């Protein structure tokens, strides 16, 4: 009999908004309902949890009985669309208390939704959100740049990166330019 392993959370991947926006491939790892759902990021790694930092520029409360909040978080490369509702009451309360504009750090699950006309929308289901300062945002940009470049350096050598190439036709130079542009906006 195999010993029960302790529950381990998946690492939260750092990803820029412009890369997450291009994400289209989602899959379930396993057959049961508790199996995790992953996305393959265009830079070549699977993720079911992401860590983002940016400026909360907009927040909107929606619903009457099933209240939830939508928001926009902007990083140097684009916009993340975030949501928090009754499925994560602490995250919803955290988001409700933050007044834009504010630098925020968010851990959440990437969510893909295909519209009737075939467009794919990507949002982040918030697990936690906190106000941070500009220095934290700048450090996140540096860390995210490093992790993105590491994924691109390994591109084509892992199953996930080969799947990304198949699904997206990823051109690493495009993402290297995104990293360069993001770094140019950091104040060190």
Regions found by a protein language model. Give the residues of each.
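OB-fold (S1/OB) nucleic-acid-binding surfaces
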Residues: 61-88, 132
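A general secondary-structure signal for short beta-strands and their flanking turns/coil
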Residues: 47-49, 66-68, 103, 119-121
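Short nucleic-acid-contacting surface segments enriched for D/E, G, S/T with interspersed K/R
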Residues: 45, 88-107
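Short, surface-exposed secondary-structure boundary micro-motifs
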Residues: 55, 109-110
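Extended, charge-rich, solvent-exposed interface segments
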Residues: 97-103, 109, 116-188
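Catalytic micro-motifs at enzyme active sites that drive phosphoryl/nucleotidyl and oxygen chemistry
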Residues: 40, 59-61, 92-95, 113
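OB/S1-fold single-stranded nucleic-acid-binding modules
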Residues: 1-42, 162-188
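Structural detector for short beta-strands of small beta-barrel domains
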Residues: 47-65
């Amino acid at each position: 009999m195999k010993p029960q392993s302790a529950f381990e959370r998946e690492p939260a991947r750092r990803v820029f908004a412009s890369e997450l926006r291009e994400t289209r491939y989602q899959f379930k790892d396993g057959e049961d309902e508790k199996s995790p759902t992953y996305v393959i990021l265009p830079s070549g790694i699977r993720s079911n949890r992401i860590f983002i930092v940016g400026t909360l520029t907009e927040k909107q409360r929606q619903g009457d009985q099933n209240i939830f909040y939508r928001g926009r978080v902007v990083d140097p490369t684009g916009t993340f669309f975030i949501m928090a509702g009754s499925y994560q009451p602490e995250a919803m309360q955290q988001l409700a208390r933050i007044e834009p504009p504010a630098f925020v750090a968010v851990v959440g699950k990437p969510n893909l939704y295909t519209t009737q006309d075939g467009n794919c929308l990507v949002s982040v289901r918030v697990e936690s959100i906190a106000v941070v300062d500009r220095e934290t945002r700048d450090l996140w940009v540096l860390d995210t740049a490093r992790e993105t470049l590491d994924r691109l350096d390994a591109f084509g050598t892992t199953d996930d990166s080969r799947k990304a190439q198949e699904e997206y036709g990823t051109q690493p130079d495009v993402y290297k330019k995104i990293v360069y542009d993001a770094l140019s906006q950091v104040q060190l």
